[in-house]
């Protein structure tokens, strides 16, 4: 009886067929995922420049906001702490100024102060739709000379550190030296106390018991050597 012979199929074709039957469908990549904005980041429609500014007090800084389209009004938001929500920035006349030219909006702050520290966001609201786009933010850090209160605080801190160092020196250097000196003095006193230890006072001879040494007569005359006869 003739047996049925299976046609030889390459193993890699079978593996590929099994993978196609068992694998989940892979979603097609969207065009916006393939072509990301090279100038910005996750804030797709608008981006800010620079992302961080550090200037001394009294300088003038500018923050730029670039947009894909010029349609819509641009406003600026500001928050001082990271965990706060951005609030509408109140422009001070003569010191803060905002300008918009087609796809570029600029915020200018003159004579920056410590109160201007924070993160600034540009926000665009389109005219045709209700969509609102917000930039990633620009952090401003104002640097300058310390105030009188800060100087006093630093001086107090320095005095405290010096006091702590002095106490540590006394504790770890001077105190051990005094302890060693005190130990040496006590050791010398103990040696003096043990000088007459074991001596029985009752058995010692008194002054009257001391026998007077009497010298005998000399057998040789002056000038004669004792070895001569």
Curated annotation (Swiss-Prot):
| Segments crossing the lipid bilayer | 160-180
Listed InterPro entries: Ig-like_dom, Ig-like_dom_sf, Ig-like_fold, Ig_sub, Ig_V-set, Phos_immunorcpt_sig_ITAM
Start and end of every Ig-like V-type domain?
38-138
Which Gene3D superfamilies does the UniProt entry name for this protein?
Immunoglobulins (2.60.40.10)
Q: Which residues lie on this side of the membrane: Extracellular?
A: 29-159
Q: Which CDD domains match?
A: IgV_CD79b_beta
What is the annotated localization of this protein?
Answer: Cell membrane
Record PTM Phosphotyrosine, positions in chain? 196, 207
Where would I find the ITAM domain in this sequence?
185-213
According to the record, the signal peptide region is 1-28
Q: How is it modified after translation?
A: Phosphorylated on tyrosine upon B-cell activation by SRC-type Tyr-kinases such as BLK, LYN and SYK.
Q: Please list the GO biological process terms of this entry.
A: adaptive immune response; B cell differentiation; B cell receptor signaling pathway; immune response; response to bacterium; signal transduction
Q: Which GO terms describe its cellular component?
A: B cell receptor complex; external side of plasma membrane; extracellular exosome; IgM B cell receptor complex; plasma membrane
The membrane topology term of the UniProt record is: Single-pass type I membrane protein
Q: Outcome of residue 161 to W?
A: Blocks IgM BCR assembly
Q: Which residues are glycosylated?
A: 73, 101, 127-128
Q: What does the record say about tissue specificity?
A: B-cells.
Query: Topological domain, Cytoplasmic: which ranges?
Result: 181-229
Q: Which UniProt keywords apply?
A: Adaptive immunity, Cell membrane, Disease variant, Disulfide bond, Glycoprotein, Immunity, Immunoglobulin domain, Membrane, Phosphoprotein, Receptor, Signal, Transmembrane, Transmembrane helix
Keyword Lyase belongs to the record: no
Mainly localized where?
A: membrane
Listed disulfide bonds for this chain?
43-126, 65-122
Its quaternary organisation is:
Heterodimer of alpha and beta chains; disulfide-linked. Part of the B-cell antigen receptor complex where the alpha/beta chain heterodimer is non-covalently associated with an antigen-specific membrane-bound surface immunoglobulin of two heavy chains and two light chains. Interacts with LYN.
Per the entry, what this protein does is: Required in cooperation with CD79A for initiation of the signal transduction cascade activated by the B-cell antigen receptor complex (BCR) which leads to internalization of the complex, trafficking to late endosomes and antigen presentation. Enhances phosphorylation of CD79A, possibly by recruiting kinases which phosphorylate CD79A or by recruiting proteins which bind to CD79A and protect it from dephosphorylation.
Protein name, as recorded: B-cell antigen receptor complex-associated protein beta chain
What organism does the record attribute this protein to? Homo sapiens (Human)
Q: What is the lineage of its organism?
A: Eukaryota, Metazoa, Chordata, Craniata, Vertebrata
